[in-house]
């Protein structure tokens, strides 16, 4: 007979949700280096796929610029973030400028975006599993098996 309560892990260390900040930075940096890569990334991910909130905001402002057929570069992105009141919240001009540093190759953006998407999918699975667990623990009816 199974126990009535699930044992709590003795000293389970907190776990970080799946993410890859290097891939996120590489997506953003690749777009700043080569605007043509934005459509490749946008076909795979949206802003919600980013783990870091600053990266989500930056990508969403890039999307705004793209939708208005404006170039996406350091100047226009900084201006768009400033207009949205988000420039300092994402790390300021220095952080935006640093995104182009260390981008392995802008032509690899599809692979970087796939990594970001995969990590977002894993996070969503964790959120869904936790929601299911919560619902199961709070259920006041018998489960139909």
Feature-to-residue mapping (PLM):
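Non-catalytic interaction/clamp surfaces of large macromolecular machines
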Residues: 125, 130, 134-145
